[in-house]
Curated annotation (Swiss-Prot):
Family annotation (Pfam families): Guanylate_kin
Catalytic reactions on record: GMP + ATP = GDP + ADP
Protein name (Swiss-Prot/TrEMBL): Guanylate kinase
Record-listed E.C. numbers: 2.7.4.8
Gene Ontology CC annotations of this record: cytosol
Protein family: Belongs to the guanylate kinase family.
Primary gene name: gmk
Binding site for ATP: 14-21
Length: 197
């Protein structure tokens, strides 16, 4: 008889510009049992993004076909684009015993928690709204209208932080990374099953 952890779904959410994507990237480097859930999206690729690695980029028509075929664990419209989590890919990783890391918003969290077990949710806050706005401006990837839209959306997203299992303030990147990894390790210790081989 061999002991093995069941795969967990670990969700990171935050307003845009809080460091969530950078934290996810570093978590994947330091934890060999984590795998990233790659979302399907209708948005255009940003500079340096690769189809099948960062996202699966699809047209609106292709995305809607996947919705009709019930291929998503969850999906939502964010800003003017659709994002969805491919169901079979996640199931395969969990079955292999990996923990699957998600980078999704509160709408996706609600949907996944309704349909799936072993879900751990972590909301990442900026130190302040003012610092968040400055981070968005420093990124220099969005125009003024998009920044205003992201700031409005941030207020809405932050209002859902109390729905998460954990809330972490990203005021120091390396400390925030350490806290999130400690949460994951502790949750694994609570979630194991034995399998006969």
């Amino acid at each position: 008889m061999k002991f093995k952890n069941k795969g967990l779904i670990i969700i990171l959410s935050s307003p845009s510009g809080t460091g969530k994507s950078s934290l996810a990237k570093e978590l994947l480097k330091i934890d060999n049992n984590l795998r990233l859930s790659i979302s399907v999206t209708t948005r255009k690729p940003r500079l340096g993004e690769v189809d099948g690695i960062n996202y699966y980029f699809k047209s609106d028509r292709e995305f809607k076909t996947l919705v009709k075929q019930n291929k998503f664990l969850e999906y939502a419209k964010i800003y003017n684009d659709y994002y969805g989590t491919p169901k079979e890919y996640v199931k395969m990783l969990l079955k292999q015993g990996f923990d699957v890391l998600f980078d999704i918003d509160w709408q996706g969290v609600r949907s996944i928690k309704k349909n799936t077990n072993n879900v751990i949710t972590i909301f990442i806050l900026p130190p302040s709204i003012e610092i968040l706005e400055q981070r968005l401006r420093n990124r220099a990837t969005d125009n003024e209208e998009t920044i205003k839209l992201r700031m409005q959306s941030a207020q809405n997203e932050i209002s859902h932080a109390n729905e998460y299992d954990y809330v972490v303030i990203n005021d120091d990147f390396s400390q925030t990374l350490k806290k999130i990894h400690e949460i994951i390790v502790a949750e694994r210790a609570k979630n194991f099953a034995y399998h006969e081989y």
